[in-house]
Amino acid sequence: MVQACEGRSRAQLPTLSLGADMTQPPPTKAPAKKHVRLQERRGSSVALMLDVQSLGTVEPICSVNTPREVTLHFLRTAGHPLTRWTLQHQPPSPKQLEEEFLKIPSNFVNPEDLDIPGHASKDRYKTILPNPQSRVCLGRAQSQEDSDYINANYIRGYDGKEKVYIATQGPMPNTVADFWEMVWQEDVSLIVMLTQLREGKEKCVHYWPTEEEAYGPFQIRIQDMKEHPEYTVRQLTIQHQQECRSVKHILFSAWPDHQTPESAGPLLRLVAEVETPETAANSGPIVVHCSAGIGRTGCFIATRIGCQQLKARGEVDILGIVCQLRLDRGGMIQTAEQYQFLHHTLALYAAQLPPEPNP
């Protein structure tokens, strides 16, 4: 059972074979060799019994990777760098991208491995859980066993920088105060919301006020609001006791669940809205959420990292980005369609960059 709040081996899964038939009729009678006997039962105290004299007749003992080790190995080492030119003029086909995407391990958390009493009441989806090694722990309230729990993970950004983002689920009625506690604790100055409140069914509760409201010990006020064609920007203040901080809230609603926007332009404009001097100056992570906190959330974070790679290096490793995201929070980027759209969006961004200098 794992309860960690903040560990991130790759190897091929070897197959063991004993080769051809090893029993041959001896020309003369010889003492029969003892067979190698292996008895192993999970959870039992049965011993491993080997005739050491017979070890030379079989293949050398080697370690066998567990599926978990294989998953981590893939996510830590896989990559497919694409230059700006390749991304624009010779991109992988949709079929190739689908095949590539389907090979990426999801790295979802087994509910049995999340040993946190009462967490289920704070999970919007019972199978979408925070990976233990990178989960956010609330540190202020200590009155209950599960008081540190929120369904959220720290996410690395460009060049592997730690805690650039927090990916989380859309707040629920009983987690709104926890959400604002996380915003305060982590000194968050930007929240990016990528879902509507309802899309057939509830995806997220209305966790900010129309004017002013208290959520637990935090007083939230709306200071300003600007409507853009694809998104709405609100300037908020969050106050705790005598201290007051500013938080920018961006609601991008033109993105259907499990799908992609109609075009890549609005998403790139959203990324540009985030790229401000204020964002760069703030040391706290950017909170990003949709409903489950993995699909649209993963696409936005991957798009921003991809833009930064293209601008700085002239190439982008989208496969490597998604693998890094899934190490931090399982299931980031939910569908092959989203993976294909990510390539399309970054190809459009590459075309907008200044021409590369001649070698």
From Swiss-Prot:
Domain named Tyrosine-protein phosphatase: residues: 97-349
Sites bearing Phosphoserine, chain numbering: S44, S93, S143
Protein task: May play a role in the regulation of T and B-lymphocyte development and signal transduction.
Coiled coil residues, start to end: none
Lineage: Eukaryota, Metazoa, Chordata, Craniata, Vertebrata
The EC number(s) this enzyme carries: 3.1.3.48
Gene3D superfamilies per the UniProt record, alphabetical: Protein tyrosine phosphatase superfamily
Binding locations of substrate: D257, C290, S291, A292, G293, I294, G295, R296, Q334
PANTHER family: PROTEIN-TYROSINE-PHOSPHATASE
Active site: C290
Name of the protein in question: Tyrosine-protein phosphatase non-receptor type 7
Record note on modification: Oxidized at active site cysteine. Treatment with pervanadate (vanadate and H(2)O(2)) or with antigen enhanced oxidation of active site cysteine.
Tissue: Expressed in bone marrow-derived mast cells.
Catalysed reactions listed for this entry: O-phospho-L-tyrosyl-[protein] + H2O = L-tyrosyl-[protein] + phosphate
Range of residues in the leader sequence: none
